Amino acid sequence: MQVLRLQPEDTITLFNGRNGEWAATILRMGRANVAVRVEQHHAIEREAPLEVHLAVGMPANERMDWLVEKAVELGAASIQPLLAERSVLRLSADRALKKQMHWQGIAIAACEQCGRNRLPPVHAARPLQDFQAWHQSSVQRRFVLSLDTDSQPLSRVLMSQEFEGPVLLLSGPEGGLSPAEEKAALATGFHALSLGPRTLRAETAPLAALAALTLQAFN
């Protein structure tokens, strides 16, 4: 409110992260709270036609914050942070919970910024091996981002497939997934996907794939 320099009688848009949004008028403003008059509900839907879930090996430092923010803006349906063999970032149970709350807050702010009114969940970090045993069997199209030269190029996948159901994208941390982790993913129904000959950062690769899939769905 302060950043936008809003005043009483100004109109704002409210959303609850689930079902549309509401027009509202500011009645009064305090240091820590705002009173509003909630008015008309608008059943506006801004989700992408394709549901893309991200399972990402967490990059270190603030790069994960940036990944969450941009993934939400690009339309990720959910984000699952993963601890892989080559992960630099290691979290205790207590710190993992605090990080989850922090990342969910970033997701809320990203929704506010881009006008998205459905809030995607950012799940608690979990070991990759646990995720591979648990992954959503209802997601039929599962891809793991790979540096293997035999991997299918994303461009070919986009041209050859109709994406009607949800998609799950798995990517590694700095250094990528280990050979054993990638082999385990392929054994559980993932297909290896290439983003080209260059080595992308851990936070760049899933966002590039997400953006390409989302644009294809909108077209």
Regions found by a protein language model. Name each.
Residues 17-18, 58, 125, 146-148, ...:
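Fold-independent oxyanion-binding glycine-rich loops
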Residues 7, 77, 191:
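Short acidic/polar active-site loop segments enriched in Thr and Asp
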Residues 39, 45-144:
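RNA substrate-binding interface of SAM-dependent RNA methyltransferases
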Residues 137-138, 142-182, 190-194:
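Active-site/ligand-binding-proximal alpha/beta "capping" segment
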Residues 12, 36, 119-123, 192:
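Generic structural signal for residues in well-ordered beta-strands
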Residues 179-219:
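Structured adenosyl-cofactor binding patch, chiefly the S-adenosyl-L-methionine
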Residues 1-43, 94:
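N-terminal positively charged helical leader segments and presequences
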